[in-house]
Amino acid sequence: MQWVIQMQYRSFQQAPQAWHHRQRGFSLIEISMVTAIMMLIAIIGIPAIQAYVIENKTPRVAEEIQRFVARLKSHTHGFGTAPYSGVNSATLVNAMRSSTVVSVNGSGTGASVAHGLGGKGSAGQGVITIAPQSLDGSAHGAAFGITLNHVNHAACPGLASIIQRIADVVTIAGKSGSVIVKDMSREPSQPYDALLADEQCISGDRNTFTFTFR
């Protein structure tokens, strides 16, 4: 009986010590496994979140461009055969400076408009540009082109599908160079092809959209 009591007493003394060992925390292997899982979630999740944000922003960017085009056309209506010969980056910057959808970076001749659909939004990447164009043998400046470069594939073909409603020509450069997906300036005309537009987009921020208006 005394032997049993002594054994129980020893077990009682050792119990806190064993409990103390169990409370030391996670092992290095366990911490490494948790870190690896968190990194994997970040690698998979961040691009998916980015694509979701861009996809939802695309209609707002397209509508902002449509408003700009409508204003520019109304301001230059009746200005001869080449009303857009003087359009440049300043034209776009001044019109977009108060926008809550796109952002203007810099000032003066070095200012640029970031579309927010891919790219850095500076240094000529992920920006919107404008330039005079000609269509169907017309004078240079009879039309103008708006280009969005470094666009993420999540904006395709939504961006083209919305803006094409008011554009005469739409081209997409992505998978296989510059491809015309709509051209109403020639005979016979080429209606917009959404499937062709979707096929041209390549994964990542590597797509360029150009819309020509007159």
PLM region spans:
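N-terminal single-pass transmembrane signal-anchor helix
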Residues: 2-4, 8, 14-61
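Residue-level marker of positions within ordered structural domains that often coincide
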Residues: 12, 73, 161-164
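Generic signature of intrinsically disordered, low-complexity segments enriched in small/polar residues
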Residues: 12-15, 29, 55, 71, ...
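Short alpha-helical basic/polar micro-motif
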Residues: 47, 66, 157
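Membrane-proximal N-terminal amphipathic helix
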Residues: 50-100
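Periplasmic/extracellular, small/polar-rich flexible segments of pilin-like filament-forming proteins
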Residues: 81-214
